[in-house]
Each structure stands twice: as C-alpha cells, then as structure tokens.
Amino acid sequence: MNSMEFPLLDRTTPNSVISTTPNDLSNWSRLSSLWPLLYGTSCCFIEFASLIGSRFDFDRYGLVPRSSPRQADLILTAGTVTMKMAPSLVRLYEQMPEPKYVIAMGACTITGGMFSTDSYSTVRGVDKLIPVDVYLPGCPPKPEAIIDAITKLRKKVSREIYEDRIASQQEDRCFTTNHKFRVGRSIHTGNYDQELLYQSPSTSEILSETLFKYKSSLSSHELVN
C-alpha cells in the first residue's frame, strides 16, 4: 500500500502572530453563537421545532434557544402577528442587546397571509414593526429552508461592519395608515351601574301582572261558588 504523508505543521515559530480586525474577530465569534428567541404563534413554528431532533440537529450551528430577550441576539417570528400582540413583539425586540437580528418565517409573518385580506386585527408584515434581516417565505417553510435561512444570516454576519449596521437601521418605525393604534377610553372601570342590574318594571309589565292576578282570583271565586 502506498503511504500517505500529511504535511507537518510548522512548529519552529512558537511566537506566531494572527493579524485581524476587531470587526472580523467579533463576526467570527458570533457566527456559531446565535441564541434565538423563539416567537412562534402559528403552525410555522412546528417546522422549526423539527430542527431540534437528531435528523437536522440545529445544535451544530451553535443555536441555543433562550427564554429571555436580554440573553438572545436573534428573534425568529413564525406565524400571524395581530394588532394586540404587536406592542409585545416590539417590546421584546427592544429588550434584546445589540447586535440583534430578525428572521421572518412564513407567509403569515411576512405579508399577513390569508388573514390579511379581510381581517382588521392582523399586521400585514412584521417589517412594519421591527427591521427584518432574512425573509423566509413558505406556508409553512420546510426545515431545510430554515437551515438555509440561518446559513444566509451567518454569511451576512461574517461580512458585517458594526458601524454600518447601526447607521442603516431605521430609528422611527411606524405602522401604515391601516395599522395606527388609537388610545381609547376603557369601558371596564370596575363600577357597575345599579340601574342596569336592577331595573324597575315597566308600566306594561305591571298591568299584565295585575290582570293575571285578577283573572286568577276570578277563577278561584267561580270554583268556590
């Protein structure tokens, strides 16, 4: 058999020097340490849950799901986002430390899906609330597509310059004309109107009750006679 020789490592220079930049070092350290905050509201999230199994094994990408937004640098939105849940989603995003990323997963998250045509309570795109880095279309997207989206996000992180990212972010994000919140006066004050609970009987009810008693008295008088 032919012997295979591997090149020997150069061990003659113990004082080796690695030349890099702070941006490259930071990007390299964040490539395999993305900690996602899972924000699943619909059936698309079931496809992401399949990545936890041994077939796809998302641990090889360094993904460690976190339950606190203060410990996460990636939020993955999957499913329909309603107007009532929109402030909570924005609050979770604001609590995440910089740099932070967003993956919009599924048609309902990206455009509102089938609920966006005639629903008054559906946000027509999560990018109206928070900036999105990677769009992942599908209804629902397959686990292979999710892995591809994570790979694309890692490539984006590897070529990223931190100062450019901060400058490119939109500071004042607002809703569209159809998605404006209006502060209304609460109708649940805790004080109940006694007049609504105990209403006085109307005149017609009194007359009908009196007539019924009069007829019953006549019938009993006839039976006695």
Swiss-Prot record:
GO terms for biological process: aerobic respiration; electron transport coupled proton transport; photosynthesis, light reaction. This is NAD(P)H-quinone oxidoreductase subunit K, chloroplastic. InterPro entries: NADH_UbQ_OxRdtase-like_20kDa, NADH_UQ_OxRdtase_20Kd_su. It catalyses: a plastoquinone + NADH + (n+1) H(+)(in) = a plastoquinol + NAD(+) + n H(+)(out); a plastoquinone + NADPH + (n+1) H(+)(in) = a plastoquinol + NADP(+) + n H(+)(out). NDH shuttles electrons from NAD(P)H:plastoquinone, via FMN and iron-sulfur (Fe-S) centers, to quinones in the photosynthetic chain and possibly in a chloroplast respiratory chain. The immediate electron acceptor for the enzyme in this species is believed to be plastoquinone. Couples the redox reaction to proton translocation, and thus conserves the redox energy in a proton gradient. Binds 1 [4Fe-4S] cluster. GO terms for cellular component: chloroplast thylakoid membrane; respiratory chain complex I. [4Fe-4S] cluster binds at C43, C44, C108, C139. Its EC number is 7.1.1.-. The gene is ndhK. NDH is composed of at least 16 different subunits, 5 of which are encoded in the nucleus. Its main location: plastid. Belongs to the complex I 20 kDa subunit family. Keywords: 4Fe-4S, Chloroplast, Iron, Iron-sulfur, Membrane, Metal-binding, NAD, NADP, Plastid, Plastoquinone, Quinone, Thylakoid, Translocase, Transport. The keyword NAD applies. It is a peripheral membrane protein. Pfam families: Oxidored_q6 (PF01058). It is found in: Plastid, Chloroplast thylakoid membrane. One of its GO terms (molecular function) is 4 iron, 4 sulfur cluster binding. PANTHER family: NADH DEHYDROGENASE, NADH DEHYDROGENASE [UBIQUINONE] IRON-SULFUR PROTEIN 7, MITOCHONDRIAL. Its cofactor is [4Fe-4S] cluster.
